[in-house]
Swiss-Prot record:
Belongs to the gamma-glutamyl phosphate reductase family. Coiled coil: none annotated. One of its GO terms (molecular function) is NADP binding. This is Gamma-glutamyl phosphate reductase. Pathway: Amino-acid biosynthesis; L-proline biosynthesis; L-glutamate 5-semialdehyde from L-glutamate: step 2/2. It holds the Pfam family Aldedh. GO terms for biological process: L-proline biosynthetic process. Keywords: Amino-acid biosynthesis, Cytoplasm, NADP, Oxidoreductase, Proline biosynthesis. One of its GO terms (cellular component) is cytoplasm. The gene is proA.
């Protein structure tokens, strides 16, 4: 069977499985998720062995450190995946819930019911944990899903796929509800993008090149998990000691992830006191500063002059753009020009400035006096996420179970006819 036929067959089987899954009981779905958590714990050694094969191949191919970090599984990350399974299992099941109702003058009772999106195709790179997160969220929301991970994670993804299949079968749910593409041929992506008859929405999660390619090729709606060019604005009068720790966490904890900080905008009033403290705190961790002319002398030996192309750059590394700004207007203008609608934060003591920043900074999460690293489904209480949408339709921000459903109108009558 050639690739086109193989992918079309997967789409047909996903559509059939999705119809069954949409009618599945909450107990059956929760049972599959709980069993998957147990399997992840019991089969940890096999998962780590598969991941080791991927890591060895990636190292031989010269993969850079940030991508290696995203590829790597550990006992701790497997424990986190198991915990996410149990957390999502315990969440309220949205499918079939009638969220709101109102009565019309003619007596009709009108409501909106939560329903699955249908069949989702997920295309992603490097991260094996996305295989589990995507599967459990789609399952909970009643969606079938076709998962196409990166070739660099193929052994890890297939090992996890086997556990998902086992968990589904254990409670009588269709194994085809979650399918992982087993071939690494990149032609698969183009074939998935053609299947509008069988796939309702496609979600690319990865580098800018992948996302643009999917947007260009897809015949169905695309929910984009675009790059994370995240900024922090240090307001006049901010708590500088607190801000230093926020910036350190946002940049240094995991510099290769999409909610890591990439740009630091500092009010001119605070630059002389704040930037040397930042240089000392972050410089000890090897952060390189790409600095504007005004900030360069305040950052010491760790700073180099910024270039125009550094604006809007997702560095995925221990590199931070630094600019001094005159006021919030200039900070917001920079964010509007170079941000990616992902995450923006402000450090301030001024409530009015905080509320203005929340209103005017255009991003899927805007935070006051907190790290950008909190833009994450688990951290925001969603249990897990299939991605962080930077598109405002159909969802904006981390996509959990609720965001993988839509609504339909339901009407209760007593024989009414339209006049």
């Amino acid at each position: 069977m050639n690739i086109a036929s193989q992918i079309e067959d997967m789409g047909r089987r996903a559509r059939a499985a999705g119809r069954r899954l949409a009618a599945a009981s909450p107990a059956a779905k929760a049972g599959a998720l709980d069993h998957l958590a147990t399997l992840l714990e019991q089969r940890q050694d096999a998962i780590l062995a598969a991941n080791a094969a991927d890591l060895a191949a990636a190292a031989e191919a010269g993969m850079d450190a940030p991508r290696m970090d995203r590829l790597r599984l550990t006992p701790a990350t497997i424990a986190e995946m198991a915990a996410a399974c149990r957390h999502v299992a315990a969440l309220p099941d949205p499918v079939g819930a009638i969220e709101t109702q109102w009565q019309r003058p003619n007596g009709l009772l009108v409501g909106k019911m939560r329903i699955p999106l249908g069949v989702i195709a997920m295309i992603y790179e490097s991260r094996p944990n996305v295989t589990i997160d995507s599967a459990i969220l789609c399952l909970k929301a009643g969606n079938a899903v076709i998962l196409r991970g990166g070739s660099e994670a193929i052994h890890s993804n297939l090992a996890l796929a086997a556990l998902i299949t086992e968990a589904l079968s254990s409670v009588g749910l269709p194994a085809e509800a979650v399918q992982v593409v087993s071939t690494t041929d990149r032609a698969v992506i183009a074939e998935l993008c053609k299947l509008e008859e069988h796939i309702d929405v496609i979600i690319p999660r990865g580098g800018e090149t992948l996302i643009r390619a999917v947007v260009d090729m897809a015949r169905m709606p695309v929910l984009k998990h675009y790059k994370g060019v995240c900024h922090a604005y240090i307001d006049s009068g901010a708590d500088l000691a607190q801000a230093v720790e926020i910036i350190h966490n946002a940049k240094v904890q995991r510099p290769g992830v999409c909610n890591a900080l990439e740009g630091l905008l500092v009010h001119r009033d605070e630059a002389a006191a704040f930037l040397p403290a930042i240089a000392e705190r972050l410089g000890n961790d090897g952060v390189e500063f790409r600095a504007c002319p005004a900030s360069l002398p305040l950052l010491g030996d760790s700073a180099i002059p910024m270039k125009d192309e550094d604006n809007g750059q997702e560095f995925h590394d221990l590199i931070l753009l630094v600019r001094i700004v005159d006021d919030m207007d200039e900070a917001l203008a920079h964010i509007a020009a170079y941000g990616s609608n992902h995450t923006e934060i402000i450090c301030t003591r001024d409530h009015g400035n905080a509320m203005r920043f929340l209103r005017e900074a255009d991003a899927s999460m805007v935070a006051v006096n907190a790290s950008s690293r909190f833009n994450d489904g688990g951290q925001l209480g969603l249990g897990a996420e299939i991605g962080i949408s930077t598109s405002k339709l159909h969802s904006y921000g981390p996509m959990g179970v609720q965001e993988l459903t839509t609504t339909k109108f339901v009407v209760f009558g007593a024989g009414q006819i339209r006049q």
